[in-house]
From Swiss-Prot:
SUPFAM superfamilies: Aldolase (SSF51569). GO terms for cellular component: cytosol. Catalyzes the condensation of (S)-aspartate-beta-semialdehyde [(S)-ASA] and pyruvate to 4-hydroxy-tetrahydrodipicolinate (HTPA). The record marks 44, 107 as: Part of a proton relay during catalysis. This is 4-hydroxy-tetrahydrodipicolinate synthase.
C-alpha cells in the first residue's frame, strides 16, 4: 500500500493558459529529491476541470515520462460524466500509472446509488486501480461511509481520498472497510490527526511548497511519533489555512511562484491569479511556516 505524503501537483501554465512542460519536469524532479511518496497529476490542484481530455491525458503521461519510474504517478481521472471518466481510465491503463483518482461527480449531484454505479462502471472498465475522492465542499455531493464500504468490495477500488476534514468520518469508514483499503486525507489542516488516527497518507496541497516537511510529518505520524509529527504540523499550520484563502489552486500557485517553483502563478479561466489583497497574507504564512525569509 502506498503511504505518506502524496502531492496534489499544480499544473504549470503560461499567461495564455498553455501548459509549461519544462516547469512540470522541474516540479517532478523537485518532488523526487524532496522525498514525496507519489504525485497526483491533474487532480483538483492541477486544474482538471479546465483541461480538455487530450490535454489532461498529455499532462499525466508527460509527468509519468518525467518521473521515469522514480516516483509513482497517480492520474486525476475523475469527471462528472461517467463516460468521460471511463475514457480517461482506459487511456491510463497499462501506461505505468499506478492508480486513478476519481472525484465524486460535481454539479449534477447524483444519489448514493448513482455514485455507486458511477464508480463501479469506472472500476469495471479496465484494470487500472481506482482511488475514490470525496470532497463535498467542491462537488455539493457527499459520498457516505456506507457507499464507500459497498465500493470497497469491488476489486479495482483500492482506497479513498476523504476531504471532508471530519475525523469522525475516518472512524466511520475505517469501521466498514478491510484493513488493506487505503485511507488518504484530502484536508491538510487535519491531515496529521488523520494519520495519527489510523489513516495511511495525505494527498496534499501543502506538499507543493513544503515537500520535505510534509514527508517528515507523515513519517513521524505513521510511526506513532505524535509529538514530532505535531511539531511540524504546527509549523505548517499557517499555510494549511491560507492556501485556501481563495479557491484551490489559486493561492498555492501564487505561493509556488513566490518561492521560485513556478515562473508564473497563472491559472486557466475562470480561475484568476490570487487577489492582490490576499498576497501579503499568503506571503506572511510562508514566512511563519519558515518556508521563506
Amino acid at each position: 500500500m502506498l503511504t505518506g505524503s502524496i502531492v496534489a501537483l499544480v499544473t504549470p501554465m503560461d499567461k495564455t493558459g498553455e501548459i509549461d512542460f519544462l516547469t512540470l519536469k522541474q516540479l517532478v524532479e523537485f518532488h523526487i529529491k524532496s522525498g514525496t511518496a507519489a504525485i497526483v497529476a491533474v487532480g483538483t490542484s492541477g486544474e482538471s476541470a479546465t483541461l480538455d481530455v487530450d490535454t489532461h491525458a498529455k499532462v499525466v503521461i508527460k509527468a509519468l515520462e518525467f518521473a521515469d519510474g522514480r516516483i509513482p504517478i497517480i492520474a486525476g481521472n475523475g469527471a462528472n460524466s461517467t463516460s468521460e471518466a471511463v475514457l480517461l481510465s482506459k487511456r491510463f491503463a497499462d501506461s505505468g500509472i499506478i492508480a486513478g483518482l476519481n472525484v465524486t461527480p460535481y454539479y449534477n449531484k447524483p444519489t448514493q446509488e448513482g455514485l455507486f454505479q458511477h464508480f463501479k462502471a469506472i472500476a469495471e472498465s479496465c484494470d487500472l486501480p481506482q482511488i475514490l475522492y470525496n470532497v463535498p465542499g467542491r462537488t455539493s455531493v457527499d459520498m457516505l461511509p456506507e457507499t464507500v464500504a459497498r465500493l470497497s468490495k469491488i476489486k479495482n477500488i483500492i482506497g479513498i481520498k476523504e476531504a471532508t476534514g471530519d475525523l469522525n468520518r475516518l472512524a466511520d469508514i475505517k469501521a466498514l472497510v478491510a484493513d488493506d483499503f487505503a485511507l488518504y486525507s484530502g484536508d491538510d489542516a487535519t491531515g496529521c490527526d488523520f494519520l495519527l488516527q489510523g489513516g495511511h497518507g495525505v494527498i496534499s496541497v501543502t506538499t507543493n511548497i513544503a515537500p520535505v516537511e510534509m514527508a517528515k510529518m507523515c513519517e513521524y505520524a505513521l510511526s506513532g511519533q505524535a509529538d514530532l509529527a505535531k511539531k511540524i504540523d504546527n509549523q505548517l499550520a499557517p499555510v494549511h489555512k491560507y492556501l485556501f484563502i481563495e479557491s484551490n489552486p489559486i493561492p498555492v500557485k501564487w505561493a509556488c511562484a513566490e518561492m521560485g517553483l513556478l515562473p508564473s502563478a497563472d491559472c486557466r479561466l475562470p480561475l484568476m491569479m490570487l487577489d492582490k489583497k490576499y498576497q501579503p497574507i499568503v506571503r506572511n504564512a510562508l514566512i511563519e511556516a519558515k518556508l521563506i525569509s
